[in-house]
């Protein structure tokens, strides 16, 4: 059996597969937790302590009681932050700003991109799943959630295509 290495569009996920993969996390949201810095790891006490120690400036916003509540809620689940989730479903595994830097066809019109476009604001990314909706891992004490773009026009600052990772052929903007 010969080893076949896919290149170009064949190596990318199709836009509809990215959306299917993203929706899996929504359907199984009880198994997942937002945890800053997590990229798909089981949230044990040791792993959570490591992630907290790795980003002390981020975690300063929470009191020790709030951190305990976050850890209690997250314990045993698979952890993702916003970019970890987008990286898992698209294959672009990096932080939110770098995901945005890799996007093409950027626009401030949040309705201009096709389904599977990236929605962005500084420090956060999510996935447009079409029909005016998006999915993301928003913040601590949350899992994968769905939202309406129309209710978040002041939240997001742009949309773009993750062209090197997603094949948008055949995708429409609704």
What are these regions (language model features)?
Residues 121-124:
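Short, surface-exposed coil-to-beta transition loops
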Residues 127-154:
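Catalytic Cys-His active-site segments of thiol-dependent hydrolases/isopeptidases
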Residues 84-101, 130:
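Short, basic/aromatic beta-hairpin or loop at an interaction surface
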Residues 114-117:
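Loop/turn positions that initiate beta-strands
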Residues 155-165:
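Short coil-to-beta transitions that initiate beta-strands within beta-rich domains
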Residues 1-83, 91-92, 137, 163-174:
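N-terminal capping segments
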Residues 7-8, 44, 102, 147-152:
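Compositionally biased, intrinsically disordered low-complexity segments
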Residues 102-110:
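Short alpha-helix capping/helix-loop boundary micro-motifs
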């Amino acid at each position: 059996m010969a080893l076949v290495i896919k290149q170009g569009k064949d190596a990318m996920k199709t836009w509809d597969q990215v959306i299917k993969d993203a929706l899996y996390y929504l359907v199984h949201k009880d198994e997942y937790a937002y945890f800053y810095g997590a990229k798909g790891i089981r949230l044990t006490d040791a792993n959570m302590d490591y992630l907290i120690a790795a980003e002390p400036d981020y975690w300063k916003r929470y009191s020790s009681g709030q951190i305990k509540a976050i850890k209690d809620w997250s314990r045993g689940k698979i952890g993702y932050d916003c970019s970890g989730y987008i990286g898992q479903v698209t294959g672009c595994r990096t932080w939110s700003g770098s995901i945005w830097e890799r996007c093409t066809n950027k626009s401030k019109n949040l309705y201009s991109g096709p389904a599977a476009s990236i929605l962005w604001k500084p420090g956060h990314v999510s996935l447009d799943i079409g029909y005016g909706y998006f999915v993301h891992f928003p913040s601590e004490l949350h899992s994968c959630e769905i939202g309406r773009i129309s209710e978040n026009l002041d939240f997001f600052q742009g949309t773009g295509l993750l062209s090197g990772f997603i094949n948008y052929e055949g995708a429409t903007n609704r």
